Protein backbone atom coordinates (compact mmCIF):
# COMPACT_ATOMS: atom_id res chain seq x y z
CA UNK A 1 0.00 0.00 0.00
CA UNK A 2 2.31 2.81 1.17
CA UNK A 3 5.54 0.80 1.21
CA UNK A 4 6.99 2.65 -1.80
CA UNK A 5 7.03 5.85 0.31
CA UNK A 6 8.97 4.26 3.18
CA UNK A 7 12.43 5.71 3.78
CA UNK A 8 14.31 8.89 4.52
CA UNK A 9 13.91 11.82 2.13
CA UNK A 10 15.84 15.12 1.93
CA UNK A 11 14.42 18.31 0.41
CA UNK A 12 16.24 19.21 -2.83
CA UNK A 13 13.99 21.87 -4.35
CA UNK A 14 11.07 24.08 -3.39
CA UNK A 15 8.96 26.22 -5.68
CA UNK A 16 6.36 28.83 -4.67
CA UNK A 17 6.38 27.72 -1.01
CA UNK A 18 6.33 31.28 0.37
CA UNK A 19 3.22 32.17 -1.66
CA UNK A 20 1.52 28.96 -0.51
CA UNK A 21 2.34 29.66 3.16
CA UNK A 22 1.03 33.22 2.72
CA UNK A 23 -2.25 31.82 1.31
CA UNK A 24 -2.52 29.45 4.29
CA UNK A 25 -2.14 32.45 6.61
CA UNK A 26 1.39 31.93 7.93
CA UNK A 27 2.96 35.14 9.28
CA UNK A 28 5.98 36.83 7.69
CA UNK A 29 8.65 35.81 10.23
CA UNK A 30 7.52 32.17 10.34
CA UNK A 31 7.42 32.05 6.51
CA UNK A 32 11.01 33.31 6.29
CA UNK A 33 12.36 30.76 8.78
CA UNK A 34 10.28 27.87 7.38
CA UNK A 35 11.22 28.80 3.81
CA UNK A 36 14.93 28.49 4.59
CA UNK A 37 14.61 25.12 6.37
CA UNK A 38 15.62 21.98 4.47
CA UNK A 39 13.55 19.28 6.14
CA UNK A 40 14.22 15.57 6.15
CA UNK A 41 11.13 13.36 5.96
CA UNK A 42 11.17 9.91 7.51
CA UNK A 43 8.23 7.76 6.41
CA UNK A 44 7.49 4.41 8.02
CA UNK A 45 4.65 1.89 8.04
CA UNK A 46 3.76 -0.37 10.96
CA UNK A 47 0.76 -2.56 10.13
CA UNK A 48 -1.94 -0.17 8.95
CA UNK A 49 -0.41 2.89 10.64
CA UNK A 50 1.70 5.27 8.56
CA UNK A 51 4.08 7.70 10.30
CA UNK A 52 5.61 10.77 8.68
CA UNK A 53 8.31 12.57 10.66
CA UNK A 54 9.67 15.92 9.50
CA UNK A 55 12.96 17.07 10.99
CA UNK A 56 14.52 20.48 10.32
CA UNK A 57 16.17 23.44 11.99
CA UNK A 58 12.71 25.11 11.94
CA UNK A 59 10.68 22.44 13.73
CA UNK A 60 10.34 18.69 14.18
CA UNK A 61 6.87 17.22 13.66
CA UNK A 62 5.37 13.76 13.52
CA UNK A 63 2.01 12.47 12.37
CA UNK A 64 0.74 8.90 12.58
CA UNK A 65 -2.45 7.92 10.84
CA UNK A 66 -4.55 5.22 9.25
CA UNK A 67 -5.64 5.80 5.68
CA UNK A 68 -9.11 7.32 5.44
CA UNK A 69 -9.41 8.09 9.17
CA UNK A 70 -9.56 11.72 10.32
CA UNK A 71 -7.01 12.75 12.93
CA UNK A 72 -6.02 15.89 14.82
CA UNK A 73 -2.78 17.52 13.69
CA UNK A 74 -0.78 20.51 14.86
CA UNK A 75 1.06 21.82 11.80
CA UNK A 76 4.62 23.20 11.86
CA UNK A 77 3.12 26.73 11.84
CA UNK A 78 0.95 25.77 14.87
CA UNK A 79 -2.43 25.49 13.13
CA UNK A 80 -4.74 22.96 14.78
CA UNK A 81 -6.32 21.06 11.89
CA UNK A 82 -8.38 17.98 11.16
CA UNK A 83 -6.51 15.89 8.59
CA UNK A 84 -7.51 12.92 6.48
CA UNK A 85 -5.05 11.07 4.22
CA UNK A 86 -6.10 8.67 1.47
CA UNK A 87 -4.23 6.68 -1.14
CA UNK A 88 -5.44 7.92 -4.54
CA UNK A 89 -3.86 6.69 -7.76
CA UNK A 90 -0.62 5.83 -5.97
CA UNK A 91 -0.44 9.24 -4.25
CA UNK A 92 -0.96 10.01 -0.57
CA UNK A 93 -3.51 12.83 -0.61
CA UNK A 94 -3.89 14.80 2.64
CA UNK A 95 -6.69 17.28 3.26
CA UNK A 96 -6.31 19.66 6.21
CA UNK A 97 -9.41 21.51 7.46
CA UNK A 98 -9.45 24.35 10.01
CA UNK A 99 -11.54 27.46 10.67
CA UNK A 100 -13.63 26.93 7.54
CA UNK A 101 -10.48 26.67 5.40
CA UNK A 102 -8.97 23.72 3.55
CA UNK A 103 -5.66 22.83 1.93
CA UNK A 104 -4.54 19.70 0.08
CA UNK A 105 -1.07 18.15 0.24
CA UNK A 106 -0.40 15.44 -2.33
CA UNK A 107 2.65 13.22 -1.91
CA UNK A 108 3.58 11.19 -5.00
CA UNK A 109 6.59 9.31 -6.33
CA UNK A 110 8.02 10.56 -9.63
CA UNK A 111 11.27 9.06 -10.98
CA UNK A 112 12.22 7.81 -7.48
CA UNK A 113 11.71 11.31 -6.05
CA UNK A 114 9.03 12.24 -3.52
CA UNK A 115 7.08 15.20 -4.90
CA UNK A 116 4.80 17.21 -2.61
CA UNK A 117 2.16 19.42 -4.17
CA UNK A 118 0.61 21.81 -1.65
CA UNK A 119 -2.53 23.57 -2.91
CA UNK A 120 -4.82 26.20 -1.39
CA UNK A 121 -7.21 28.47 -3.29
CA UNK A 122 -5.39 27.91 -6.57
CA UNK A 123 -1.93 28.64 -5.11
CA UNK A 124 0.37 25.64 -5.60
CA UNK A 125 3.79 24.95 -4.08
CA UNK A 126 5.94 22.04 -5.26
CA UNK A 127 8.59 20.53 -3.02
CA UNK A 128 10.85 17.73 -4.26
CA UNK A 129 12.67 15.26 -2.01
CA UNK A 130 15.30 12.65 -2.89
CA UNK A 131 16.14 9.52 -0.94
CA UNK A 132 18.80 10.23 1.66
Swiss-Prot record:
One of its GO terms (biological process) is long-chain fatty acid transport. One of its GO terms (molecular function) is long-chain fatty acid binding. It is found in: Cytoplasm; Nucleus. Keywords: Acetylation, Cytoplasm, Lipid-binding, Nucleus, Phosphoprotein, Transport. Pfam families: Lipocalin. Its main location: cytoplasm. The modification Phosphotyrosine is found at residue 20. The modification Phosphoserine is found at residue 13. The modification N-acetylcysteine is found at residue 2. GO terms for cellular component: cytoplasm; nucleus. A motif (Nuclear localization signal) lies at residues 22-32. A fatty acid binds at residues 127-129. Monomer. Homodimer. Interacts with PPARG. Forms a beta-barrel structure that accommodates the hydrophobic ligand in its interior. Lipid transport protein in adipocytes. Binds both long chain fatty acids and retinoic acid. Delivers long-chain fatty acids and retinoic acid to their cognate receptors in the nucleus. Belongs to the calycin superfamily. Fatty-acid binding protein (FABP) family. This is Fatty acid-binding protein, adipocyte. It comes from Cervus elaphus.
